[in-house]
UniProtKB/Swiss-Prot annotation:
Gene transcribed to yield this protein: rpmE
Superkingdom as given in the UniProt entry: Bacteria
Protein's name in the database: Large ribosomal subunit protein bL31
Protein species of origin: Clostridium perfringens (strain 13 / Type A)
HAMAP family assigned: Ribosomal_bL31_1 (MF_00501)
SUPFAM superfamilies: L28p-like
Binding site for Zn(2+): C17, C19, C37, C40
Lineage: Bacteria, Bacillati, Bacillota, Clostridia, Eubacteriales
């Protein structure tokens, strides 16, 4: 490997989630902020989050006159 071109690796990077969970990992950044982690992700918690896309569907149907 060439010297001087690789970023500094931090073995104790703190990852902070929006839900309040924190954990450490390795990264080239000293601190990471994430919106979702294994403590709050629906796949790991078993809870479903419903994403509201009804407005987009209605807008599409209205634009192309697909109302029945």
């Amino acid at each position: 490997m060439r010297q001087g071109i690789h970023p500094e690796y931090h073995h104790d990077t703190v990852v902070k989630c929006a839900c309040g969970n924190t954990f450490t990992t390795g990264s080239v950044k000293p601190e990471l902020k994430v919106e979702i982690c294994s403590k709050c992700h629906p796949f790991f918690t078993g809870k479903q989050k419903i994403v509201d896309v009804g407005g987009r569907v209605d807008k599409f149907n209205k634009r192309f006159n697909l109302n029945k």
